Amino acid sequence: MSSKGSVVLAYSGGLDTSCILVWLKEQGYDVIAYLANIGQKEDFEEARKKALKLGAKKVFIEDVSREFVEEFIWPAIQSSALYEDRYLLGTSLARPCIARKQVEIAQREGAKYVSHGATGKGNDQVRFELSCYSLAPQIKVIAPWRMPEFYNRFKGRNDLMEYAKQHGIPIPVTPKNPWSMDENLMHISYEAGILENPKNQAPPGLYTKTQDPAKAPNTPDILEIEFKKGVPVKVTNVKDGTTHQTSLELFMYLNEVAGKHGVGRIDIVENRFIGMKSRGIYETPAGTILYHAHLDIEAFTMDREVRKIKQGLGLKFAELVYTGFWHSPECEFVRHCIAKSQERVEGKVQVSVLKGQVYILGRESPLSLYNEELVSMNVQGDYEPTDATGFININSLRLKEYHRLQSKVTAK
């Protein structure tokens, strides 16, 4: 069979993408396997050997951890992004980062196709493909789980296992957990399997990034986190003096401390972009600490009205990231506006991390809008109390008129 051309497969080394690799070869493609090191616990060399053994023409293992932190996580921290009030977007942020490198490899290797193992019901198919089409409009995407010839052949995990046996694909000796997991530097997600029943509690042993808060240390870690332009630039453990200043090391250290204290666990039902609700359990240790610390220093340094506008932009940013529009012009515009709002978000925040909680202890900033003398109950400062009378009278006018009308309506 003559080759249909080269395809760059986003490969994880797991059962699904290993079967997809072999299946793509069956279809006549030359497969280039691409593994993104985005902070997950993975034996990358073992995955490389496995991909080559299964017939991959080339294997690229790309460490994108630092750019993931600096170019994707930091903008999310600046924006205080939460999807539907709770989800810190760990998976959503990783996908455009992974896809960007996948497209780079495809262009460098002259591949016309890219492929992924995302299911036809989830958000990731959208995130991967919108990123790929944005960065390389001529690229063609092969999405096996949306192709009838694939999903009619592989109707479940048992079919994949049988295919793996037939084609010499190594199968894990230990039974797979009855749920799916996806990990990166920012978080780990758990879904599907027994978790599809939203009533089922997370089974013991599910969580891997964080300690059970009930079993966490009884003594807190006190951290001082320094921000410049809304980005963390230094973290210091006040108790033992440990300091980290580079982005990746800082983030990894916060993951370690937060994980030890059981910080960052959530169990939610969310609305997928394609229209269905899904249940997800997430651990986002460092991201949770930084969310709270950044929120505090931002409130301390940012003008009230600017912050109201910025909060709206943060909601839009979260929606765009969740739905896969990272590379869209509107998301670029929103990121630029948020970055502008962060120019004076500078200072230090002290936090206590204890038994699943993050407590703000104090903050300081050379650019704070907080005026201790002005707000003091003991010092009048540059404020005339009698001015408040007119302020209250003007603001009460609208309320008086509204209730005057209500009285008339009620009387009738």
From Swiss-Prot:
Changing R157H: In CTLN1; loss of argininosuccinate synthase activity. Changing G362V: In CTLN1; mild; no effect on affinity for aspartate; no effect on affinity for citrulline; decreased argininosuccinate synthase activity. Changing R157C: In CTLN1; decreased thermal stability; loss of argininosuccinate synthase activity. InterPro entries: Arginosuc_syn_C, Arginosuc_syn_N, Arginosuc_synth, Arginosuc_synth_CS, Arginosuc_synth_type_1_subfam, AS_cat/multimer_dom_body, Rossmann-like_a/b/a_fold. The modification Phosphotyrosine is found at Y87, Y113. The keyword Amino-acid biosynthesis applies. Expressed in adult liver. Pathway: Amino-acid biosynthesis; L-arginine biosynthesis; L-arginine from L-ornithine and carbamoyl phosphate: step 2/3; Nitrogen metabolism; urea cycle; (N(omega)-L-arginino)succinate from L-aspartate and L-citrulline: step 1/1. The modification N6-acetyllysine is found at K112, K165, K176. GO terms for cellular component: cell body fiber; cytoplasm; cytosol; extracellular exosome; mitochondrial outer membrane; nucleoplasm; perikaryon. The keyword Repeat does not apply. Gene3D superfamilies: Argininosuccinate synthetase, chain A, domain 2, HUPs, Single helix bin. Acetylated by CLOCK in a circadian manner which negatively regulates its enzyme activity. Deacetylated by histone deacetylases. L-citrulline binds at Y87, S92, N123, R127, S180, S189, E270, Y282. It is found in: Cytoplasm, Cytosol. Homotetramer. Interacts with NMRAL1. Interacts with CLOCK; in a circadian manner. Forms tissue-specific complexes with ASL, SLC7A1, HSP90AA1 and nitric oxide synthase NOS1, NOS2 or NOS3; the complex regulates cell-autonomous L-arginine synthesis and citrulline recycling while channeling extracellular L-arginine to nitric oxide synthesis pathway. It is linked to Citrullinemia 1: The classic form of citrullinemia, an autosomal recessive disease characterized primarily by elevated serum and urine citrulline levels. Ammonia intoxication is another manifestation. It is a disorder of the urea cycle, usually manifesting in the first few days of life. Affected infants appear normal at birth, but as ammonia builds up in the body they present symptoms such as lethargy, poor feeding, vomiting, seizures and loss of consciousness. Less commonly, a milder form can develop later in childhood or adulthood. This is Argininosuccinate synthase.
